[in-house]
From Swiss-Prot:
<keyword id="KW-0648">Protein biosynthesis</keyword>
<dbReference type="Pfam" id="PF05746">
    <property type="entry name" value="DALR_1"/>
</dbReference>
<dbReference type="InterPro" id="IPR008909">
    <property type="entry name" value="DALR_anticod-bd"/>
</dbReference>
<dbReference type="InterPro" id="IPR035684">
    <property type="entry name" value="ArgRS_core"/>
</dbReference>
<dbReference type="InterPro" id="IPR009080">
    <property type="entry name" value="tRNAsynth_Ia_anticodon-bd"/>
</dbReference>
<dbReference type="InterPro" id="IPR001412">
    <property type="entry name" value="aa-tRNA-synth_I_CS"/>
</dbReference>
<dbReference type="InterPro" id="IPR001278">
    <property type="entry name" value="Arg-tRNA-ligase"/>
</dbReference>
<dbReference type="GO" id="GO:0005524">
    <property type="term" value="F:ATP binding"/>
</dbReference>
<dbReference type="GO" id="GO:0004814">
    <property type="term" value="F:arginine-tRNA ligase activity"/>
</dbReference>
<comment type="subunit">
    <text>Monomer.</text>
</comment>
<comment type="similarity">
    <text>Belongs to the class-I aminoacyl-tRNA synthetase family.</text>
</comment>
<dbReference type="Pfam" id="PF03485">
    <property type="entry name" value="Arg_tRNA_synt_N"/>
</dbReference>
<dbReference type="GO" id="GO:0006420">
    <property type="term" value="P:arginyl-tRNA aminoacylation"/>
</dbReference>
<keyword id="KW-0436">Ligase</keyword>
<protein>
    <recommendedName>
        <fullName>Arginine--tRNA ligase</fullName>
        <ecNumber>6.1.1.19</ecNumber>
    </recommendedName>
</protein>
<dbReference type="InterPro" id="IPR005148">
    <property type="entry name" value="Arg-tRNA-synth_N"/>
</dbReference>
<dbReference type="InterPro" id="IPR014729">
    <property type="entry name" value="Rossmann-like_a/b/a_fold"/>
</dbReference>
Length: 550
């Protein structure tokens, strides 16, 4: 019996209890809250439904709780129920009912934890979207990990998800990139507002290799050659780095295409028709303050060139016309102002502002020997994705970046995350999986097969704690998806790994010496295999490997 199953049982029981007494059943919440008590002595689960409903139906909370207890104790799945405090109900689940969690996990396999909770959404998930002017920095790397995990999570909860990278290849930063390449090719210092680092020199050399005559060309042809080849080489490197990091995209959209295809002009024309564009001081303004923004925004500057938001308007409209009902943007810490701005764009175009969600990620700091790591040899200035992977590996990098809420800054201790230690969270979780795989191999060598026939034998408190933890997986995934917080999955896996290690230390799974394998061994092996499956499913959501040996 999972928490969701118990919540359904509590609601149906409460409905019957109220109905039998002529009380209003509509006072019940759509979903009854079920929680695991902090103190295991208080039971397996607790609910506050009596406290929620009693006042609405005109009875004392403890009276309603008492009626619920009377009805629940007769149910086969309930081993015990009692009133606590002002009207809480503490519950103990029967071992055989609890054991169905194990059987269900083994039956569902890789799909365990999946649901259709997000099935109504067709989601465009845009993340990373780094400028093609240098390698992906550590902030973008955080989004590469979190965005990919969120996409996997939402897909497991039934959403149709398209992972998209918006390629910012339009604007002044590209001009600075091109001037930096040309300066490097000529053996000069980078422009004061340009880019430096080994990667600039490498790309400049490759441009000359492909077009030996490039430096002899006159402008604007020379800049166009460096732009075309240089941007392509940089973007190729970015995509390769992301792929090696385990993050792939379904769609790459070029910002420049919004302008060259006429999409920007079309979007602005649509806003003019609805009266949401006006003219002032020679510029065209969006009435964004009418839709929750703190001020109106210039969309066409007085010199006739589109402002940056013009591309955002066209891009959002493009997404909607491609069939997405929800557009999630994952942006850096300096983009808080974009939340109201993008929602205003949606509303001005006639869509629900809630069709835009903006997640803001905070800073990432790297630490080695207690000191901050600030410089990258490759990039010349900032730490990059490749730097982090070189230091601690893909799995540790992804896990370290995912396991904390994105709205908090994180410090990554490179020594800790590279260590084979239980203090290293990813090692701790992966070791639990590898240990389970080793146990399964040893069981096979002994001829022991798992069985779900006698799961009622799993009555040890450590077995119960592990089973109840496994039963939370579906609810964890649903909440994590709804809140757009994949870090909840990582923290859950650490809890499950802890539950498993404590179970293993207290409950012998394999027969010893001449001991004949029995039903309890087979049931415990089934519990171990179910635990292995849940850990593997969770690591898959995070894009982290589940090693069979360590």
């Amino acid at each position: 019996m999972t928490p969701a199953d118990l919540a359904d049982l509590l609601r149906s029981t409460a409905t019957t209890v109220l109905d039998e007494r002529g009380l209003d059943t509509s006072a019940l919440p759509a979903v009854v809250t079920v929680e695991r008590p902090r103190n295991p002595e208080h039971g397996d689960y607790a609910t506050n439904v009596a406290l929620q409903v009693a006042k609405k139906v005109g009875v004392a909370p403890r009276d309603l709780a008492g009626w619920l207890v009377e009805a629940l104790v007769s149910h086969a799945a309930i081993a015990g129920a009692e009133i606590a405090g002002p009207g809480f109900v503490n519950l103990r689940i029967a071992a055989d009912a609890q054991g169905t969690i194990v059987a269900n996990i083994l039956k569902a396999g890789e799909t365990y934890g999946n649901s259709d909770a997000q099935g109504t959404h067709t989601i465009n998930l845009e993340f990373v979207s780094a400028n093609p002017t240098g390698p992906i920095h550590i902030g973008g790397t955080r989004w590469a990990a979190v965005g990919d995990a969120l996409g996997r999570l939402l897909a497991r909860q039934g959403a149709k998800v398209t992972r998209e990278y918006y390629f910012n290849d339009h604007g002044a930063q590209i001009d600075r990139f091109v001037r930096s390449l040309i300066a490097s090719a000529e053996g000069k210092e980078a422009p004061e507002d340009g880019y430096a680092g080994d990667y600039i020199a490498d790309i400049a050399k490759q441009v000359i290799t492909q077009r030996p005559e490039a430096l002899t060309l006159t402008e604007p042809e020379r800049s166009e050659v460096f732009r075309e080849i240089g941007v392509d080489l940089m973007f190729t490197h970015i995509k390769e780095s992301l792929h090696e990091f385990g993050t792939d995209f379904d769609v790459f959209t070029h910002e420049d295409s919004m302008h060259t295809s006429g999409r920007v002009q079309e979007a602005i024309a649509q806003l003019r028709k609805t009266g949401n564009i006006y003219e002032k001081d020679g510029a065209s303004w969006l009435r964004s303050s009418n839709f929750g923004d703190d001020k109106d925004r210039v969309v066409i500057k007085s010199d006739g060139n589109p402002a940056y938001i013009a591309g955002d308007i066209a891009y959002y409209l493009d997404k909607r016309e491609r069939g997405f009902d929800l557009c999630i943007y994952m942006l850096g810490a300096d983009h808080h102002g974009y939340i109201a701005r993008l929602k205003a764009v949606a509303a001005a175009l006639g869509y629900d502002a809630d069709s835009v969600e903006v997640l803001i990620g905070q800073m990432v700091n790297l630490v080695r020997d207690g000191q901050p790591v600030r410089m990258s040899k490759r990039a010349g200035t900032v730490i990059t994705l490749d730097d982090l992977v070189d230091a601690i590996g893909v799995d540790a990098a992804r896990y370290a970046l995912i396991r904390s809420s994105v709205d908090t800054s994180i410090d990554i201790d490179l020594e800790l995350w590279a260590s084979a230690s239980s203090e290293n969270p990813v090692y701790y979780v992966q070791y639990a999986h590898a240990r389970l795989c080793a146990l399964a191999r040893n069981a096979a060598d002994l001829g022991l097969q798992h069985s779900t026939e006698h799961l009622e034998l799993l009555t040890h408190e450590k077995e119960g704690a592990l089973i109840r933890g496994l039963g939370e997986f579906g609810r964890i995934l649903q909440n994590a998806a709804a809140l757009r917080e994949p870090h909840r999955v990582a923290r859950y896996l650490e809890d499950i790994a802890g539950d498993y290690h404590r179970f293993y230390d207290s409950c012998r799974v394999l027969p010893q010496g001449d001991e004949t394998p029995g039903d309890l061994h087979a049931a415990r092996l089934a519990l171990c295999l179910a635990t292995r499956q849940v850990i593997a499913n969770g690591l898959d959501i995070l894009g982290v490997s589940a090693p069979e040996r360590m």
